[in-house]
A protein has these predicted regions:
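Conserved catalytic cores of phosphodiester-cleaving nucleases, focusing on short active-site segments
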Residues: 2-26, 41
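Short, solvent-exposed loop/turn segments at secondary-structure boundaries
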Residues: 28-32
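Metal-dependent nuclease catalytic regions and adjoining charged, substrate-binding loops involved
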Residues: 44-126
């Protein structure tokens, strides 16, 4: 997640727009991976006095072909997504609570990061 790529203005409402470049066509579940990012952009717009429209756009690009060795043709796939700034606010609240604790929470068997940390921990500390 970085800075907002673009912002559409519809009347007095603001719609975040984020560009994504991939090496392959968008899979059905891919847009959902960016839900938190779009919710956070919406919250930041709201907190800065801009009325969010309640939705945002992801625009995915992937290469179709390379012409003449120097020109690449891309396919564009826009996806409209509903946004909820209150879900972003809740993420921030939970982060503050977690960061204020003196120790890390116990590992969760379903957490990919916990699994990774368990595997690399011995390597890193060696």
């Amino acid at each position: 997640m970085g800075a907002l790529d673009d912002c559409l203005i519809q009347g007095d409402r603001y719609l975040p727009l984020d560009y994504k470049t991939r090496g392959y066509p968008v899979k059905e579940e891919t847009p959902s991976y960016y839900q938190n990012q779009l919710n956070i952009y919406t919250l930041l717009l709201q907190e800065n006095g801009r009325e969010p429209a309640g939705c945002a756009y992801l625009v995915f690009y992937h290469p179709l072909e390379q012409n003449d060795g120097s020109r690449i043709t891309f396919h564009m796939h826009p996806v409209k997504m509903d946004t909820d700034p209150e879900r972003a606010r809740e993420i921030f609240r939970k982060a503050v609570v977690l960061l204020s604790k003196r120790s890390c929470p116990p590992a969760d068997g379903e957490c990919g990061f916990c699994e990774w940390a368990t595997r690399v921990g011995p390597i890193v500390s060696a």
